[in-house]
Regions:
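His/Asp/Glu-rich, glycine-adjacent segments
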Residues: 56-133, 137-140, 179-186, 193-310
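Alpha4 helix (beta4-alpha4-beta5 surface) of REC/receiver domains from two-component response regulators
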Residues: 3, 16-32
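His-Asp phosphorelay/catalytic-motif detector in bacterial-type signaling
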Residues: 4-9
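The C-terminal output helix
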Residues: 20, 48-61
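C-terminal output helix
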Residues: 20, 38-47
């Protein structure tokens, strides 16, 4: 049957409970396996699961979001803490992905709620950001705190760490690729707040230095590149990591690699065995950031990623078919804790405004 029409779901009904037959059935991509005696409800459930599954999931998801819509709206209005906003964001990301395949169009409803959340969150950040900068002891986890509060405690505990930063990688994109790693890893997720501006030259330098940009400029002027300079703004990341390790009086051995293309990714895969003697290995993956810029500048990519769902799909395809997944596979089982994070995300602009001025205008 599969040879003639591989898309037809096949349900096997048998008396046999032999494991070898079960394995053979699973290996031949059987849709379901029922052992006699079988009651009518079992048959009905199997048919529904294989024939009407997508319709049932779509209907259930739509009803679920309609019920949750009001609760999320109340949560947006009542959010007073950084943890509250993290929960709002996680819920919106969850429903955005769940509604992706819904046959009932709910995207406008979700987009409206995301806009409402963005407006309220902007006011929240405006009200609290200065306090976060002036009082680091009471602020949420932010870019300069990642190494101090997440990486160093693991290293101090005797763990070895791979710190993999995927540039411009959003939570919804992480959720899109997470299942590809489930076979090799268990997960402990948490969110953090990027500094402002969230642009790479500020946010990522802040992560690797453990400092705010102004502090980097004052303490290490030779490692800071001004906004109006033609020089690359993220060329000193390895030295910044070194300064942070020395500032906290650690003696960890570390490596740093930035992957721009598949050729360098292959090179990195080849030297993984030589990296295993380091206590800390830092890897920056740039593809997602390149993809986000191409979505603006390249017509073909713009067509391929014209919706957020399509953008996530492209991210998954890259993760699965590039050397990135292979990198995670090779690290797995080598005694390393792996931290996957990002420096910032991206927002798809629906109503652009053209601003004309000198390139140094802020």
């Amino acid at each position: 049957i599969k040879a003639i029409n591989p898309d037809v779901p096949v349900v096997m009904v048998t008396k046999s409970e032999e494991e070898s037959i079960m394995n053979q059935a699973i290996g031949n991509k059987i849709a379901d396996y029922l052992i006699k005696p079988v009651n009518p409800n079992q048959l009905l459930l199997s048919i529904k699961k294989n024939v009407h599954k997508n319709v049932i999931i779509s209907e259930t998801t739509t009803v679920g979001y309609q019920q949750e819509f009001g609760r999320i709206g109340m949560q947006i209005n009542d959010s007073l803490t950084t943890d509250d906003w993290m929960e709002v964001y996680k819920k919106l990301v969850y429903w955005e992905i769940e509604l992706e395949n819904s046959q009932v169009p709910m995207t406008d409803m979700l987009r409206m709620q995301k806009q409402e959340a963005n407006n309220a969150f902007g006011k929240f950040v405006k009200k609290n950001y200065v306090d976060w900068i002036q009082h680091p002891e009471i602020r949420p986890l932010m870019s300069p705190d990642l190494f101090k509060k997440k990486v160093f405690p693991m290293l101090d505990n005797g763990d070895k760490v791979f710190f993999i930063l995927i540039d411009n990688f959003r939570l919804d994109q992480w959720r899109e690729v997470k299942d590809l790693l489930a076979e090799y890893y268990t997960f402990d997720e948490s969110l953090y707040y990027s500094i402002l501006p969230t642009a790479t030259q500020y946010a990522r330098n802040s992560i690797f230095s453990g400092l705010m940009p102004l502090q980097i400029e004052k303490m290490f002027p030779e490692l800071w590149v001004d906004e109006d300079s033609e020089e690359g703004k993220n060329l000193n990341e390895a030295p910044l990591i070194q300064t942070q390790i020395e500032r906290f009086r650690k003696k960890y051995t570390f490596s740093y690699h930035k992957v721009h293309d598949s050729q360098y990714n292959d090179k990195l895969l080849n030297i993984v065995p030589s990296l295993l003697h380091n206590q800390l290995n830092v890897v920056v993956l740039n593809f997602v950031d390149m993809l986000s810029h191409a979505r603006t500048e390249n017509k073909m990519i713009r067509e391929l990623a014209q919706s957020e769902a399509a953008y996530r799909s492209l991210t998954r395809s890259w993760f699965q078919h590039s050397g990135t997944l292979e990198l995670f596979k090779r690290i797995a089982g080598k005694g390393y804790k792996v931290i996957v994070t990002t420096d910032h995300g991206t927002i798809r602009v629906d109503n652009p405004e053209k601003v004309i001025g000198d390139k140094n205008t802020n």
